[in-house]
Amino acid sequence: MTQIRLLATDLDGTLLRSDRTISPRTAQAMEDARLSGVEVVWATARARHSVHELAQSCGFRGKAICANGAVVLDLADGTPVITATTTIAMASAAAAMDRVRTLMPGVVFANIGPTRFVAEPAYAALCEFADHHRHPHEMTLSELLPDIDEPMVKIVARHPEVPSAELYRAAVAAGVDGVELTHSGAPYVEMAASGVSKASALAELCAVDGISTEEVAVAGDAINDVPMLTWAGTALCPSNALPEVLALADHVLPSNDEDGVASYLEGLRP
């Protein structure tokens, strides 16, 4: 059996409990894995500031793939140092947003950079803190997107009446050129630069470290985890994962509320 050298795990719905916290057991399992030579990488749709807060809560000092692969952080010294970004060209962003507006009139947007968040006022009005781990009043507002004063890594789109899963399916079926569409289970659809995913960022990290696909295990529960689940040598899903994602699992773990990822890491101990 090939030895696992790296575990990449999604956060919400996978590593985190339903209250969006990391259990003491999971924090200890990640640290024990690090000490035994198994690298743990976080792979999430979340932004830099939110990942930093989570890392501080549990003492995580590894690497984190953020914004569905568009941003990579190194938290080795406790600060969220950006080591890589993949941006969306402004022309591609404008064309993609126009396409989605045509497909679903009434859709509203926000543009996200490595550190910035710019939203249409109607987008901010639909948000709760948990949606982006920032209060709506903390968002920079702009009536005319795309509009951001740093390179754009992600576009988010939502509709006041159409569920995000339905909006995602409609956009995928119709096709939106120049961007990579995905859905994390949040109340919005996410777009990155074409070809960017958690898998693309993970593959680059592994190439630098000389880690083969077969030496990688990945845990995830949602559509945005599918690329890395199909890329890795071992696909893991918590039992609460979406049915279509569970179908990809080599191993089904206990649920996120039962510390499923921790149980897998504990099983890797020599």
Please give the residue ranges for each predicted region.
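N-terminal glycine-/serine-/threonine-rich phosphate-binding loop
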Residues: M1-V40
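Mg2+-dependent phosphoryl-transfer enzymes with acidic/Ser/Thr/Gly-rich catalytic loops
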Residues: T2-L6, R17, I22-S23, E190-P270
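Active-site metal-binding loops of divalent metal-dependent hydrolases
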Residues: L11, G69, G220-A222
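Active-site phosphate-binding/coordination module
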Residues: P24-L126
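Residue-level signal for inorganic ion chemistry
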Residues: A33, T44, N68, I155, ...
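Short active-site oxyanion
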Residues: L35-V41, F60-G62, K154, E214-E215, ...
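Short, structured coil segments at secondary-structure junctions
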Residues: C58-F60, A67-N68, A174-D177, W231-A232, ...
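Conserved acidic, metal-coordinating active-site core of Asp-based
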Residues: L103-A219, I223-P227
